[in-house]
């Protein structure tokens, strides 16, 4: 895979506060592979906008509560 993304996320925490959902269960609900969930969770892959919204919906959370992008000082 390429270089890590600057986007961070709260997916792992959200999985645990939502009944200790497994990566496999989240992958099933998103119709992606478990490996994709792992890569997104670890910041090695940025999801498509569609998948990002689906993740937020699974956790009934706003998109910016799931994903964060650092502000640029430029």
Predicted features by range, described:
Residues 1, 57, 67-74:
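Short, charged recognition helix plus adjacent turn
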Residues 25, 36, 65:
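Residues in the helix-turn-helix
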Residues 10-29:
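Short basic helix-loop element that most often maps to the first helix and adjoining turn
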Residues 32-46:
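Recognition helix of helix-turn-helix/homeodomain-like DNA-binding domains
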Residues 5, 16, 31, 42:
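Residue-level detection of the helix-turn-helix DNA-binding "recognition helix"
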Residues 50-65:
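DNA major-groove recognition helix of helix-turn-helix/homeodomain DNA-binding modules
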């Amino acid at each position: 895979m390429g270089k890590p993304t600057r986007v961070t996320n709260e997916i792992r925490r959200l999985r645990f506060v939502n009944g200790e959902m497994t990566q496999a269960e989240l992958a099933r609900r998103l119709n992606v592979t478990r490996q994709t969930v792992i890569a997104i969770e670890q910041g090695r892959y940025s999801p498509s906008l569609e998948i990002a919204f689906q993740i937020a919906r699974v956790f009934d959370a706003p998109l910016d509560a799931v994903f964060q992008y650092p502000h640029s000082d430029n």
